[in-house]
Amino acid sequence: MICHNQQSSQPPTIKTCSEGQCYKKTWRDHRGTISERGCGCPTVKPGIHISCCASDKCNA
């Protein structure tokens, strides 16, 4: 599986993942809306929105 792997302020990259899922999570803080993409489907704290998916590059 290929997932986007990126922090908000970084250029987008892709990564081959063994977890079988990709995620995209977003939240707001004093800097504005922050997003993060990667492999797997982590548990998140309240106030953080997460979307998990199971196809190549689905977390664009």
From Swiss-Prot:
Tagged with keyword Repressor: no
Tissues and organs where the protein is expressed, per its UniProt entry: Expressed by the venom gland.
Cysteines joined through disulfide linkages: 3-22, 17-39, 41-52, 53-58
Pfam families: Toxin_cobra-type
Main location: secreted
Keywords: Acetylcholine receptor inhibiting toxin, Disulfide bond, Ion channel impairing toxin, Neurotoxin, Postsynaptic neurotoxin, Secreted, Toxin
Coiled coil: none
Localization annotation: Secreted
Annotated GO MF terms: acetylcholine receptor inhibitor activity; ion channel regulator activity; toxin activity
Listed GO CC annotations: extracellular region
Aminoacyl-tRNA synthetase is among the record's keywords: no
Function: Binds to muscle nicotinic acetylcholine receptor (nAChR) and inhibit acetylcholine from binding to the receptor, thereby impairing neuromuscular transmission.
Family from the record: Belongs to the three-finger toxin family. Short-chain subfamily. Type I alpha-neurotoxin sub-subfamily.
Protein name in UniProt: Three-finger toxin Mnn I
Upper lineage: Eukaryota, Metazoa, Chordata, Craniata, Vertebrata
